[in-house]
Amino acid sequence: MSRHPAIEFLDALDSAIEATFHITTFTDLPKGAEKPKLDPLLKEFEDQTLVQVEHLLPALEQLNASGAGIFFCVNQCQGKRKKENVTRVRCVHADFDSAIQSQIDAVRQKLRPSIEVHTSGTTKHHFYWALDTADDIDVPTAEAMNRALVDLGADPAATDTSRLLRLPGFLHMKYRDRDETPLVTATFGQAQPKGGKQ
């Protein structure tokens, strides 16, 4: 039986025994749209093991169908999602949603991401470089590495280690009013993901 894409992605990104994940949902809106003062789709699921995330899937799918975007914190936090609560850096990441194709191709060729997440369209990508459990990178070092990717086309606003990015396996609901709800998907690159899954 195949696993849910969200579980496959999270396990490939961080297969450590101690791994936990922070999942957040909120109403998915286009940039600049007015946000609800009290968002009925805002949910925070802190310190979730992979098994607990599996148990959350039905609730996440229901929230997604109601118009929520499904996001996760790229690194491990203890409690509330904020930079000072990041307890373990598990990856270097970059948001290439606004990059041009030549920039994306150059990063693929030179840096070989462990995982590519395709958020919508042909040039909307998030790249991850999973770290081995033996690596010990602190928050300032990780953020410096993330910022270095800005020169290659990454979003400068998405370099913090407590960043929320879209979780594969769920629909991108930002433009549902235009009947555009692409599935967020992940592919595993030539670099070895942390969990050793290609």
Regions found by a protein language model. Name each.
Residues 1-91, 163, 171, 190-197:
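DNA replication initiation on ssDNA origins
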Residues 43-60, 118-120, 140-152:
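A signal for specific C-terminal beta-sheet/loop modules enriched in small/flexible residues
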Residues 116-128, 165:
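Short, conserved phosphate-binding/catalytic loop or strand-edge motifs used
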